[in-house]
């Protein structure tokens, strides 16, 4: 236990989550059909296997954008399939939203680090509140 009461396991878990965010947001658009886009995660082979248990949060974050129907992570091929309502969204809007999420994470690393001691649910609620505020500020529905 360190000075702040943080255990090695907690630091390890935070580093896994941080690695997932930082590596996930380096992607290429490999397929772009109306209503369906596929992204290739650039460094997916470097993601620790433990990150797979957090994919539900990535899905929830992406699906907060109105018009996203389904998000599927494929950890074998390193792709993310996003199915969306082509009458509500364009792939450019989705990519802009993903950039907004990346900015949110990078701008709030201090906040994320200071969530030590909170339950997983509390952390998710806080981060989703911050995301919703960012979305409002940047005119995302």
Enumerate the predicted regions with their spans.
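Helix N-cap motif at beta-to-alpha junctions
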Residues: 84-89
């Amino acid at each position: 236990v360190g000075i702040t009461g943080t255990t090695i396991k907690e630091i390890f878990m935070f580093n896994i989550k941080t690695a997932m965010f930082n590596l996930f947001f380096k992607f290429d658009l490999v397929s772009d059909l109306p209503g369906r886009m596929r992204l290739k995660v650039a460094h997916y082979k470097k993601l620790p296997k433990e990150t797979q248990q957090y994919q539900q949060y990535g899905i929830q974050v992406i699906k907060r954008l109105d018009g996203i129907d389904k998000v599927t992570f494929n950890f074998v091929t390193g792709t993310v399939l996003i199915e969306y309502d082509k009458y509500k969204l364009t792939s450019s809007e989705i990519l802009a939203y993903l950039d907004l999420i990346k900015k949110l994470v990078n701008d709030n690393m201090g906040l994320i680090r200071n969530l030590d001691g909170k339950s997983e649910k509390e952390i998710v609620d806080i981060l989703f509140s911050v995301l919703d505020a960012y979305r409002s500020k940047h005119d995302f529905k």
